[in-house]
Amino acid sequence: NKKPKSKVLILERGILPSGASTKNAGFATFGSLSEIISDNKTLSDNSVFNLVEKRVLGLELLKKTIPKANLNIKNYGGYELIFKNHFDLEMLIEKYNKLLYPIFNDNIFFQAKEKIKLFGFSKTKLTNLIFNPYESQIDPGETVFKLQRILLSKGVNIINGANVQDFDYSGNAFEVITKNDNEIIKFKSTFMAICSNAFAKKWFPNEDINPGRGMIIVTKPLKDLKFKGSFHYNEGFNYFRNFKKRVIIGGGRNLDFKSEATSQFGINNFIKKSLINDLHNIILQNQEFEIDMEWSGIMAFGSSKEPIVKKLSDR
């Protein structure tokens, strides 16, 4: 809106958008209690507050950008699976409810042990559930397509299948070189922004940006799925949710950090086996299920969880 006459072009290497935004499996969440506790070991209370607030404001911006009716958001709430009460749960819930209260003007963490049986989870492996009423689900594919329609309506052009090979700056303009099959196509622009998340390491090798692969598994529809919501465990490294009568489960990167520190898409069979075991032994015990599909996505990580947004030049 600042420069309505400017021509804007987005170059996307995939036939369909292939970034982490389309592969996050629809978790509109901002951090489980154990993840926030883990962050607080290296971050101050103020930094933890700011981190959660940014995530919440990002979700609010998404809701403002896309009309709620089109976002198809499901407010089922979020839950964390607690396996052992090796910490003072009541004290920590009170502490972080107090810390994060100004963001919501409300408490956000509540014990929900009674729902372990209701949801059909393992009563021998779980000792508690923590409920968060402010977390939701979205359809990431539909969300991205609706964002595309908004951009197109404002005159923004999008070219898919444009794999950027290199760029150069000379004569007050950028020259961006793309390749599709064996065809080289060059674009020129006065200004340029690189928004490729983990893949930005290719252009900025000295930046604190490292790839981290995550995988998602989706079951076939189940006859009797007992739960709805977004669920996390193991300090947020593992997550699952319902999608209609299916279960979407993912994560487990912490089981093999070294192999998953890659920008190559693919499935880690060791992690896949662990996720399937969790479905059998914790989440869908006494239920038969089949895996229908799987995929991977690449995220970006650094020494800090703060996003890197900065200008490298005036252009």
Language-model-derived ranges and their functions:
Residues 19, 23-53:
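Glycine-rich active-site loop/strand segments that organize a redox cofactor
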Residues 125-189, 195:
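Helical element adjacent to the flavin cofactor pocket in flavoenzyme catalytic cores
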